[in-house]
């Protein structure tokens, strides 16, 4: 019998990857292709959706070429993606009517601010679990419909379709046959009612978004459609798994029990907690979202987004030139002889959860004449751990659950100094996945379950393994003293609002 595999498409903010996994969950081949971001005006971030589609096709082809695997050996396809990014396209031609507006983009900020001033924050939070922000898809849809002449009327007639990137890729792969999204991606649009599991008519009416342009919303593990044979080298293969990137990482880490938490240390940090089958509405500025839905059940999650994590290490390397390679930061931190009196608050683009202070800017505090390069590097690494504690502590406050263990992935999870300090400052064990490809793995798991490639989550548990475990060993008095210093550093950073004179002219 011909051996079968699962293909995961991992569509990120700067590149697309296609990864082929075998039945043991091992990566057989992968291919990556970067695509450009466009910045038409300050604060605007856009993609060309067709460049993303081309990157999907080319990486699929290259993964097949590298592995020697045939398209008809793929049992199912899982898609994971950058969330919130918004595409609107012509149903008849498949051509986007405007560039994709990216999650990072602030060009729709005025629409979000008007929703706030008009008093809709509470309504939107209760229905969607989200705060009102330009980050999410709703304001982006409204902006494109306003920007492109005739778009509103065409959307009302059903001539235009909206999708987040998962929807766009699926629609293209199926040759326009399937217009669908999943619960996790829908829960990031700010127009999806996470209690009713449907688009919310009140919010659609508020923003004048026609329901006719919206995709069907489905669970994360089922057959949504099949590839058009002309897009998949003569083969019709089921697209059978779909999840936003952070939720895919939660599933890839098999954080399937309420109270389990994962942190992905990427450019930023995304801390996601499984809260079980009932949504926990945060009273402390965390996002309530959908974690995943399989076997007819929906698991909800709390999420805290930290804007700067791995990018702080890039800052040490590229801007400050304190390290030659990012990996050098571990040895430098270990070489520091400071008493941890230096604090770096990397608020380069403001502070994320739980502070949500867009005006804050970075700071270095506690320096003396004796402060050296290693001390600054160490304090920068420690800032990632402190910010994680900020979010984890807030999750504990919202849920009443004592978090004893954190599962981690992402590039900075390879830094053993950081992982040990993270365990110490949280007073929780840290488990690093043996396979750090947890986002793609999550998409593969969801796809494989739907087509019987894997039977159930018990079988997945046989595949998943912890690579390294870090136990806390810091005395409580020291831990709390260090964290009190961090809280002071945050307050000092929030106070400083001065801007250069020229910016205020």
UniProtKB/Swiss-Prot annotation:
It is an enzyme of class 2 (transferase). Gene3D superfamilies: 3.30.420.40. SUPFAM superfamilies: Actin-like ATPase domain. Its EC number is 2.7.1.30. Glycerol binds at residues 83-84, 135, 245-246. It catalyses: glycerol + ATP = sn-glycerol 3-phosphate + ADP + H(+). The keyword tRNA-binding does not apply. Belongs to the FGGY kinase family. This is Glycerol kinase. The gene is glpK.
């Amino acid at each position: 019998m011909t051996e079968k595999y699962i293909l995961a498409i991992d569509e990120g903010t700067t590149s697309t990857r296609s990864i082929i996994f075998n039945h043991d969950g091992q990566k057989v081949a992968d291919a990556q292709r970067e695509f450009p971001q466009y910045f038409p005006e300050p604060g605007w971030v856009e993609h060309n959706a067709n460049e993303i589609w081309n990157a999907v096709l080319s990486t699929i082809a290259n993964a097949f070429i590298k592995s020697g695997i045939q398209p008809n050996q793929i049992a199912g396809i899982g898609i994971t993606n950058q969330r919130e990014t918004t595409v609107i396209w012509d149903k008849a031609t498949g051509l986007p009517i405007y560039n994709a507006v990216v999650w990072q983009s602030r060009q729709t900020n005025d629409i979000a601010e008007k929703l706030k001033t008009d008093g809709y924050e509470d309504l939107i939070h209760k229905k969607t679990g989200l705060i009102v922000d330009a980050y999410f898809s709703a304001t982006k849809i409204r902006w494109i419909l306003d920007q492109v002449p005739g778009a509103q009327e065409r959307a009302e007639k059903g001539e235009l379709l909206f999708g987040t990137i998962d929807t766009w890729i699926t629609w293209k792969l199926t040759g326009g046959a399937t217009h669908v999204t999943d619960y996790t991606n829908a829960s990031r649009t700010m127009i999806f009612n996470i209690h009713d599991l449907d688009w919310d008519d009140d919010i659609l009416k508020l923003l004048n978004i026609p329901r006719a342009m919206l995709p069907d919303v489905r669970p994360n593990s089922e057959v949504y459609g099949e590839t058009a044979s002309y897009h998949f080298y003569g083969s019709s293969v089921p697209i059978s798994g779909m999840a936003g990137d952070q939720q895919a990482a939660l599933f890839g880490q098999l954080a399937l029990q309420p109270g389990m938490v994962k942190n992905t240390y990427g450019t930023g940090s995304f801390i996601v907690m499984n809260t079980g089958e009932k949504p926990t509405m945060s009273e402390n500025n965390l996002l309530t979202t959908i974690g995943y839905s399989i076997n007819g059940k929906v698991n909800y999650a709390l999420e805290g987004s930290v804007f700067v994590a791995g990018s702080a290490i890039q800052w040490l390397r590229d801007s400050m030139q304190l390290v030659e390679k990012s990996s050098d930061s571990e040895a430098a931190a270990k070489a520091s002889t400071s008493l941890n009196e230096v604090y770096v608050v990397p608020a380069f683009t403001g502070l994320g959860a739980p502070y949500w202070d867009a005006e804050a800017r970075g700071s270095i505090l506690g320096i003396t004449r004796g402060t050296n390069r290693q001390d600054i590097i160490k304090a920068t690494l420690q800032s990632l751990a402190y910010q994680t504690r900020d979010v984890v502590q807030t999750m504990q406050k919202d849920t009443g659950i004592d978090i004893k263990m954190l599962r981690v992935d992402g590039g900075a999870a390879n830094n053993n100094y950081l992982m040990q300090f993270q365990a110490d400052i949280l007073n929780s064990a840290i488990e690093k996945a043996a396979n750090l490809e947890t986002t793609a793995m999550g998409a593969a798991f969801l796809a494989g379950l739907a087509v019987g490639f894997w039977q159930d989550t018990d079988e997945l548990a046989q595949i998943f393994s912890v690579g390294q475990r870090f136990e806390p060993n810091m005395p409580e008095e020291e831990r709390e003293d260090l964290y009190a210093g961090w809280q002071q550093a945050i307050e000092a950073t929030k106070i400083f609002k001065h801007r250069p004179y020229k910016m205020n002219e």
